């Protein structure tokens, strides 16, 4: 009886035990997201009882995809932006703005630097006109002029022109570089006079132009035939040592090289060399280079085509008067600019 009673009690208590047992929790349903066909969607849900994220991946095979751009209830599903995405977007926008600002600043700096080196259009035109007139009338009747004329009488005119103009072009570039270097040194180490910065380079350039103008006018006014023919005699002496007949490619190259060396040595330290330095120190270097090259080209062309015929139309004394007057005129213009500045 005791065993039957105990089994009865155990049987009666079993349903009560099952009723009080709690069922295991069901995992939350993963919401569907709008996705494109063939693409998988990643959903991050926090795991119950921990801070870690459980990543589950739902593919298109689990069910038919919903129409793109719609969520539950037919509404439009807008993409969610987290803090990291917003930060990256702001950083990218700031980087683009900074890059554009730096490019504009760099372009402005380069423009200012080029304007300081080259000068504006007004300075270029003034430098071109000054250099052309000064070099042209300085080279007419000069030693280089007679060298080109005498060489052209014995060789091909085109070959002599190439050698002569090449040497004068190199000499012009060297003169302009020296003049601009002196100009920049004066800007780095300014000389103060009366509380203001005094342009030493412009003043020395004006003094150099005055010197050559006065000496040229004195030589023209003296009327000394020996002084007037000195340049031609020196040219004949230099040409007497010249070799080459300009025939053939090798001989033509040798003639051009010999002419280049001869004219370069004769032009080094000449009045046109120092006058170009003076103009480059006070004017636009681009205008001075262009004007000097144009003046050398025209004067050399006249010498090659018929330098001996120049005396029949224009005497050396008149050329000297014109050249000396131009030297003094450009010196006066430079001094006026110094006073006005």
Curated annotation (Swiss-Prot):
Low complexity biased stretches: 1-13
GO CC annotations on file: chloroplast membrane; chloroplast thylakoid membrane; Golgi apparatus
Transit peptide, UniProt annotation: 1-57
Entries under Pfam families matching the protein: GDT1
GO biological process, one term: Golgi calcium ion transport
Domain of life: Eukaryota
Signal peptide: none
Keywords: Chloroplast, Membrane, Plastid, Transit peptide, Transmembrane, Transmembrane helix
Keyword Transferase found: no
Coiled coil feature spans: none
Residue ranges of the region described as Disordered: 1-41, 54-76
The UniProt record lists the keyword Cytoplasm: no
InterPro entries, per the entry: GDT1-like (IPR001727)
Topology term for the membrane: Multi-pass membrane protein
Segments passing through the bilayer: 79-99, 117-137, 158-178, 203-223, 246-266, 286-306, 318-338
GO molecular function: calcium ion transmembrane transporter activity; manganese ion transmembrane transporter activity
Compartments (UniProt record): Plastid, Chloroplast membrane
Protein family: Belongs to the GDT1 family.
PANTHER family in the record: PROTEIN PAM71, CHLOROPLASTIC (PTHR12608:SF6), TRANSMEMBRANE PROTEIN HTP-1 RELATED (PTHR12608)
Protein name listed in UniProt: GDT1-like protein 1, chloroplastic
């Amino acid at each position: 009886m005791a065993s039957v009673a105990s089994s009865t009690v155990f049987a009666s208590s079993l349903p009560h035990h099952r009723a009080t047992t709690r069922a295991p929790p069901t995992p939350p349903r993963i919401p569907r997201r709008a996705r494109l066909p063939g693409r998988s969607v990643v959903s991050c849900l926090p795991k119950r009882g921990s801070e870690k994220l459980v990543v589950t991946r739902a593919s298109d095979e689990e069910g038919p995809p919903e129409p793109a751009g719609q969520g539950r209830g037919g509404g439009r599903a807008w993409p969610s932006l987290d803090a990291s995405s917003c930060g990256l977007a702001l950083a990218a926008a700031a980087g683009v703005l900074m890059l554009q600002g730096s490019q504009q600043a760099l372009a402005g700096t380069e423009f200012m630097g080029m304007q300081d080196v080259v000068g504006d259009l007004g300075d270029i035109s003034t430098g071109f006109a000054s250099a052309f007139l000064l070099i042209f009338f300085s080279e007419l009747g000069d030693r280089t002029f007679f060298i080109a004329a005498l060489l052209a009488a014995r060789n091909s005119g085109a070959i002599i022109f190439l050698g002569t103009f090449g040497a004068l072009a190199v000499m012009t570039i060297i003169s302009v570089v020296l003049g601009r270097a002196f100009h920049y040194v004066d800007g780095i180490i300014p000389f103060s006079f009366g509380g203001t910065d005094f342009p030493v380079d412009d003043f020395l350039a004006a003094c150099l132009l005055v010197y050559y103008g006065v000496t040229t006018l004195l030589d023209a006014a003296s009327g000394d035939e020996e002084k007037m023919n000195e340049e031609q005699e020196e040219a004949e002496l230099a040409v007497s040592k010249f070799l080459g007949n300009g025939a053939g490619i090798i001989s033509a190259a040798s003639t051009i090289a010999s002419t280049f060396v001869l004219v370069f040595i004769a032009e080094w330290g000449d009045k046109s060399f120092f006058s170009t330095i003076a103009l480059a120190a006070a004017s636009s270097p681009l205008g001075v280079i262009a004007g000097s090259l144009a003046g050398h080209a025209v004067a050399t062309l006249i010498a090659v085509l018929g330098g001996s015929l120049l005396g029949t139309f224009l005497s050396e004394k008149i050329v000297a008067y014109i050249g000396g007057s131009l030297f003094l005129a450009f010196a006066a213009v430079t001094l006026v600019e110094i006073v006005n500045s």
